Swiss-Prot record:
It comes from Aspergillus niger. Homodimer. It comes from the Eukaryota. Residues 3-106 are annotated as: N2. InterPro entries: Cu_Am_ox_TPQ-bd, Cu_amine_oxidase, Cu_amine_oxidase_C, Cu_amine_oxidase_C_sf, Cu_amine_oxidase_N-reg. The modification 2',4',5'-topaquinone is found at residue 405. Mn(2+) binds at residues 464, 606. Topaquinone (TPQ) is generated by copper-dependent autoxidation of a specific tyrosyl residue. This is Copper amine oxidase 1. Binds 1 copper ion per subunit. Can also use zinc ion as cofactor.
Amino acid sequence: MLPHPLAILSEEETNIARNVILAQHPNTVIDFREIYLSEPPKAQLLEFLALEHSGRLSPTSPRPPRLALCQYDVIGNDRIPSFEESVVDVGTRQRVQHRVVGKEHHASLTLSEFDTLVERCFASPLFQKALADFDLPEGFEVVIEPWPYGGLDYVEEKRRYFQGLCFATDKRKNNPDANFYSYPLPLIPVMDALTQEIIRVDRPATGGKGEGLTEQTFKRDIIGHCKDSDYVPELNPGGTRKDLKPLNVVQPEGPSFRITEESLVEWQKWRFRVAFNPREGATIHDVWYDGRSVLYRLSVSEMTVPYADPRPPFHRKQAFDFGDGGGGNMANNLSIGCDCLGVIKYFDAVMTGADGSAKKMPNAICLHEQDNGIGWKHSNWRTGRAVVTRHRELVVQFIITLANYEYIFAYKFDQSGGITVESRATGILNVVNIDAGKVSEYGNVVSGGVLAQNHQHIFCVRIDPAIDGPNNSVQVEESHPVPMNAVTNPNGNFYKVNTETMERAGFFDAAPELNRTVKMVNPHKKNPISQKPVGYKFIPLATQRLLADPNSIQARRAQFAQHHVWVTKYRDGELYAGGRYTLQSQEEIEGVSDAVKRGDSVVDTDVVVWSTFGITHNPRVEDWPVMPVEIFQLMIRPADFFTANPSLDVPSDKNISSRVVGNDCCRNAHI
């Protein structure tokens, strides 16, 4: 059976693409970075999907070719890598596109480059000399956490660098999971990726409020004032709680979802496909509800984490977690009963080794149902009857670990036609050393000698709507107060709802004082009851935008983070809010801001909506040593898409496994 055009590349297809690239470069060293599905041009795919949804698809129907995007370095005799991209038709085993990426761009990092950094640090006399300035207690060893270099300063030579954040770990605990972040060291070695040499060791300041940006105030006993702060249960001095009873998710008749072709999901009138790639992680495609098209594609496009400590080299501290290393590359192997509960379907991914060979990533995505409280309810006080349904959701989830931080991403589908994109931030704060007894305006002291720097986490979700078809418009709805008027508003209670259709690509920001709402509508189809165009809506999350000065490198390379909503006209391959190449970038290139600058018409056409939101994270002590989840939800809801509440037919069955607690659980309290 031929794979669906949206199915991820199989291991066999990945290896075919690899072999085609190797054949194109005989007697040359090829260092592979990524091989994954190059999604078909939208026009081709829509033709195929039309046949599929109409039931007219046959073995002889035209199909888009299976294309593999291959990213790799070609290393010649001069040992200087040339970053190149090719597209391979795995069906014909031919290379159909090829380009050499400009030297102004850097390929996303690989874990092998991080391994090299650690190895070279410990072998470097320069690093060992810097380390000799500190007296570490007996039993402590140095740990190096590799990090992207960040945005190059304008005066720096445009070479590829990596840096390491240094910590110490207490080996006397005999536990490899002991929290080394509790013991930060003020050393940051920098490696030239080409020569693989440590070219310098930056020495950040450790002072407090009122001290200079570069003042060296540390003592040789650099971690003598730091404290143990462990999070693994076996190292918790008080142990874990003993009064927590099990809470099980039980589905005795199995799940309500159905999976076919290892990518097609059907559940409660929803129909969509799940895919995965090394850049975005899990992506959602061809979303329909009850036989009607809703979305063409949904993904987490980018996120950036800029830090607010101006002391060098922290001014460069800014990660693009999807562009720099790839959200999919950093995905967890999800664990049953921990990461996901209930009756679970796992989806595997196929990734690429340094030699280009395919390797399976098991359990990259989990799919499960969950109860999220009441769906709808009404009590008729006249009859005493209450009708209530539960709000069940289908969750598509993946989790990524990026050094110290974890991010949990979930696409949630509900029975009333709603879609929620949820992100959760957890993990461990990125911390630096601070002198004993001092505080800082650049962050918060969360433990002895440990400063958690102020920073932001800014996400961008890409929404490609297909509201009853591919041609849509975007409306901005606002609710405005109206002054009292003796004729039109004599009592002052009236407010006016204004709706404007965007004419050109552009951007705007959340406005909670106006309840500013984004509506993605089909202008050719009206709701028979309201007479408004059918659509889906969301209210932009009113979170703080990027705080860095607009002229700073931080801001110039993350222009997508400067506004809450962007609206662009669709172009094939235009998927990444921060641009295709973010590693060491100095400005955003070919990102959403450039797409807006084209000034395309966005009326009754193929539009894309980008929603930016996040957290300004000024750390608190309670975030240490591991951070409770911070939750953000972008709620995409039907707006005059249906003729009534689409979940009216959800059964109001009573859950027979629920029971009342006995008197031994609930006793009278004495105050």
